[in-house]
Amino acid sequence: MDEEASRTARESLELVFRMSNILDTGLDRHTLSVLIALCDLGVNPEALATVVKELRRESIPDSVTTTPSIH
C-alpha cells in the first residue's frame, strides 16, 4: 500500500471510529477495521451487524440477563 493510500485508510478508520462513538456502538478500532475489511471482501453488512449483535448477546453474563430468584 502506498503512503497516500495508507493515510486515506487511517483517516477513514478514524472517521468510522468517531461515528461509532457517537452512535455508542462500543466497537473498538480493531473490530471496526475487521468489519470494514470483511465488507470490502463482499460480506453483507447487515449479516455482519446480526453477527455482532448475537455475539454481544452471548457475551452478556447470565446474571445480568436473568432476574434473581426470590426464595
UniProtKB/Swiss-Prot annotation:
It is found in: Cytoplasm, Cytoskeleton, Microtubule organizing center; Cytoplasm, Cytoskeleton, Spindle; Nucleus; Cytoplasm, Cytoskeleton, Phragmoplast. Its main location: cytoplasm. Mostly expressed in siliques and flowers, and, to a lower extent, in leaves, roots and seedlings, with highest levels in young tissues and meristematic cells, and the vasculature. Disulfide bonds: none annotated. GO terms for cellular component: gamma-tubulin complex; gamma-tubulin ring complex; kinetochore; kinetochore microtubule; mitotic spindle; nuclear envelope; nuclear outer membrane; phragmoplast. Disruption phenotype: In the gip1 gip2 double mutants, embryonic lethality and impaired development of male gametophytes, severe growth defects and sterility, characterized by microtubule (MT) misorganization and abnormal spindle polarity, resulting in ploidy defects. Belongs to the MOZART1 family. PANTHER family: MITOTIC-SPINDLE ORGANIZING PROTEIN 1. Required for gamma-tubulin complex recruitment to the microtubule organizing centers (MTOCs). During mitosis, modulates gamma-tubulin complex localization, spindle stability and chromosomal segregation. Necessary for gametophyte development and embryogenesis. Homo- and heteromultimer. Part of the gamma-tubulin complex. Interacts with TUBB2/TUBB3, GIP2, GCP3 and TSA1 (via C-terminal domain). This is Mitotic-spindle organizing protein 1B. It comes from Arabidopsis thaliana (Mouse-ear cress).
